[in-house]
Amino acid sequence: MSARMRVPTALLVAVALLLAGCSSGKKQQPKAAQTTSPPSTAAPAAGPLQLQLTTSAVGPERGFNPSQAAKRVTPDLQRFLTHYLTVAFLQPQQAKKGWKDFLAMFDPPVRASAKRQLDALALGSVAPKVTAVRPGRAGARATVLFSGNRPAAATVTISFDGTATTAQGSGPVRVHSVLQLVAGQPGWRIAAYDSKAGEDAR
C-alpha cells in the first residue's frame, strides 16, 4: 500500500527561495563555510522504540554553523519522529479514537488526505485486529532547512520494521516514508508525504 501527498505550491516556493538565498556565493566560500553539516547522530530514544536519527542542517552561509544547528535541532526532531512512529504503529487503540493523535501531526490542509490513506501511513484498517506491536529497526535521516537561526522545514526519510500480534498469530509491519515537515507553533507538522507500507515498503 502506498500513498503520496504533494508538497503545497506555497511550501515549494518558500523552500526554493530559501535555498536560492543559501546557495548565493557558494563557490566563493571556503570549504569550512559550506552549509551542509556533517551528520549529527542522536542516541536511541528511551524505551522499547529506538529510533536512530541522523540530522544535517542547511542555512545561510555567512555566520551559520551547520554542525551546531544540526545538533541543536536533533532532540526536538527525534521526539517528533518517535511520537509519529509510536502513535502510528505501537498504539493500535488509536483507531478507536479516529486516529486523532496521529492526524494532529499533519498540517491542516493535508489531514483529510492522510485520513484516507491510513493504510499506507499507519496500522490503518488492520489496527482493530492488532493486540500489540513489537518494534524492530527504526531509522531516519533528516535534512533541516534553517531560516536565520530557526528551523523552517525538513525532509525526512524514515523506515520502521516491527511485528504485529493478533488473535490469529503474528506478522511483519513495515513502512518507508519521505516526510516534508514545516516548523511552526507549537512544533513540527507534516506538510506532505510519500509513504509505502507492507510489501511495498521493501
Residue spans for each PLM region:
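Core segments of small alpha/beta cavity-forming domains
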Residues: 55-128
